[in-house]
C-alpha cells in the first residue's frame, strides 16, 4: 500500500510553471500536479481526453470556439482530439491522463516536459 499524498507539499516542490510532477498512479493513468502561470501552447491529444481539476487560483481552458473559466473545486475534461490552450495566473491544477501522454500533446516543442515523479 502506498503512502498518502499531500498535494500542497507536492505543489511546493514545483519550481516552475508548466512542469508537471507525478504524484500518483491510477491503473494505467498518472495523476500529476502543475502550476499554471501565463499561457501554454495550443495542442490536442488525439488518443485521450485531458482532465483538469483546479485546486487553487483560476484556470482558463481556451478552446477554438469558447473559453472555459474554472475556479477551485471545478473540473473540465477536454475531449480527445480537441485543440485547447490552458492559461492562468498562479493556478494549481491536478491532471489525470494515461502514462506516456506528453504535456504538449501533438504540438511537441521546447515546452514538452519529461514525466517525473515528485
How would you label these PLM feature ranges?
Residues 29-30, 59, 66, 82:
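Short acidic/polar mixed-charge low-complexity motifs
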Residues 64-81:
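Short acidic-glycine-tyrosine-enriched beta hairpin
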Residues 7-42, 48, 100:
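A short glycine-rich, His/Asp/Glu-containing loop-to-beta-strand
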Residues 27, 55-56, 71-72:
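A cytosolic small-molecule/anion-sensing beta-strand core signal
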Residues 32, 41, 60, 69, ...:
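General beta-strand recognition
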Residues 3-11, 24, 89-118:
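Double-stranded beta-helix
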Residues 35-37, 45-62:
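Short, conserved beta-strand element in jelly-roll/cupin
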Amino acid at each position: 500500500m502506498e503512502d498518502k499524498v499531500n498535494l500542497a507539499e507536492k505543489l511546493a516542490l514545483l519550481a516552475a510553471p508548466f512542469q508537471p510532477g507525478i504524484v500518483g498512479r491510477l491503473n494505467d493513468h498518472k495523476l500529476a500536479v502543475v502550476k499554471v502561470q501565463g499561457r501554454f501552447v495550443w495542442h490536442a491529444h488525439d488518443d485521450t481526453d485531458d482532465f483538469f481539476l483546479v485546486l487553487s487560483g483560476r484556470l482558463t481552458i481556451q478552446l477554438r470556439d469558447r473559453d472555459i473559466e474554472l475556479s477551485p473545486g471545478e473540473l473540465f475534461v477536454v475531449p480527445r482530439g480537441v485543440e485547447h490552450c490552458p492559461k492562468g495566473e498562479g493556478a494549481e491544477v491536478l491532471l489525470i491522463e494515461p502514462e506516456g501522454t506528453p504535456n504538449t500533446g501533438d504540438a511537441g516543442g521546447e515546452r514538452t516536459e519529461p514525466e517525473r515523479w515528485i
